[in-house]
Amino acid sequence: MISVSGAVKRMWLLLAIVVVAVVGGLGIYRLHSIFGVHEQPTVMVKPDFDVPLFNPKRVTYEVFGPAKTAKIAYLDPDARVHRLDSVSLPWSVTVETTLPAVSVNLMAQSNADVISCRIIVNGAVKDERSETSPRALTSCQVSSG
């Protein structure tokens, strides 16, 4: 059988923590009532306004050259990869985005000795490259256009 004094010896630390917590809680409660924290605060909130969208960006990808067809892969403004095989040249596609910045990429390869690519953002040519080699491969890239 466990004696009462043995139980007190084992539980004194837990008992001390409980007493300190209760005394501290009562003290904080009294301070809150003295400084009026229990009153409901008045908060003035401005009406919610819609965040204006960024000016839309029109991104145009173009591939051209003497070949009749080409393999094309491009990364759109939403970071989705599009792969197209045997596309008739000249080729172009335009996408629109409201992202504040665009990072796009275009790669093209043909069976001819020359191929060119171009990326246009809002009417301005941001990158244009041409490659001359057997089975020509070229790429264009725009970051934060």
Curated annotation (Swiss-Prot):
Classification via InterPro entries: MmpS (IPR008693), MmpS_C (IPR038468)
Disulfide feature: none
Membrane topology designation: Single-pass membrane protein
Keyword set, alphabetical order: Cell membrane, Membrane, Transmembrane, Transmembrane helix
GO CC list: extracellular region; plasma membrane
Induction (UniProt): Transcriptionally regulated by MmpR5.
Transmembrane segments: 11-31
Location (main, coarse): membrane
Annotated localization: Cell membrane
Family membership noted in the UniProt record: Belongs to the MmpS family.
UniProt protein name: Probable transport accessory protein MmpS2
